[in-house]
Amino acid sequence: MASSTLSPVTQLCSSKSGLSSVSQCLLLKPMKINSHGLGKDKRMKVKCMATSIPADDRVPDMEKRNLMNLLLLGALSLPTAGMLVPYATFFAPPGSGGGSGGTPAKDALGNDVIASEWLKTHPPGNRTLTQGLKGDPTYLVVENDGTLATYGINAVCTHLGCVVPFNAAENKFICPCHGSQYNNQGRVVRGPAPLSLALAHADIDDGKVVFVPWVETDFRTGEAPWWA
């Protein structure tokens, strides 16, 4: 007469779609009793139930992406890589660029950006994030002559929506999620991002920087703005 027992074992499984997570499996052990009263193992094949994990270019889930975006906001204008300072005022998830009406630019503390004060602490060539249209993280650009550029650059990557940091050492924007690259004006120069970063007008109204939707021709490409 035979009896069966179930014992848990831990297995690493694989699937056609990529790697799978460690999972708990059941190993069926039929026990055959011989004439001496001893059991003789005859193992059957293991059936493993694992949750499949997509391979390679896996996109972080939304919670992790939002956390990454928040961590990047405070340090993207720093030349030293890896120094991440969270800015608590940028909790609004990024949109797709654009908007309607003028929106005062907000700094990392949530204060209105005063153009003259901003230029005292941000040198020529600087690109620092502020909160812009629709709550999107938007770069204010200081031109090489020390003046504030008349445009802001939306930091939302046109591939999958990550916040793109500015790499001062390479003088371009490089997305940490999938490696898309944009020049220092936000024009796409390397995929997988299909489009350039969105623009917004950076006007000065009563001393304050105000973002206004950009609906004219994109000066970087000579084409109509995709975000308008």
Swiss-Prot record:
**What positions does the domain Rieske occupy?**
115-211
**Cofactor(s) needed for function:** [2Fe-2S] cluster
Q: Does the keyword Cell membrane apply?
A: no
Transmembrane portions of the chain: 71-91
Q: What does the Swiss-Prot or TrEMBL cofactor note state?
A: Binds 1 [2Fe-2S] cluster per subunit.
Alphabetized CDD domains for the sequence: Rieske_cytochrome_b6f
| EC number from the UniProt entry | 7.1.1.6
In this UniProt entry, which cysteines form S-S bonds?
162-177
List the molecular function annotations (GO) for this entry: 2 iron, 2 sulfur cluster binding; electron transporter, transferring electrons within cytochrome b6/f complex of photosystem II activity; metal ion binding; oxidoreductase activity; plastoquinol--plastocyanin reductase activity
EC class, as a word, reads translocase
Catalysed conversion reaction: 2 oxidized [plastocyanin] + a plastoquinol + 2 H(+)(in) = 2 reduced [plastocyanin] + a plastoquinone + 4 H(+)(out)
Task: Give the superkingdom in one word.
Answer: Eukaryota
Transit peptide feature, positions: 1-49
State the NCBIfam families in the record: Cytb6fFeSPetC (NF045928), PRK13474.1 (NF010001)
Q: Beyond the main fields, what else does the record say?
A: This protein is 1 of 2 subunits of the cytochrome b6-f complex that are encoded in the nucleus. The Rieske iron-sulfur protein is a high potential 2Fe-2S protein.
Q: How does it assemble?
A: The 4 large subunits of the cytochrome b6-f complex are cytochrome b6, subunit IV (17 kDa polypeptide, petD), cytochrome f and the Rieske protein, while the 4 small subunits are petG, petL, petM and petN. The complex functions as a dimer.
Q: Which family does it belong to?
A: Belongs to the Rieske iron-sulfur protein family.
Supply the name of the protein. Answer: Cytochrome b6-f complex iron-sulfur subunit 2, chloroplastic
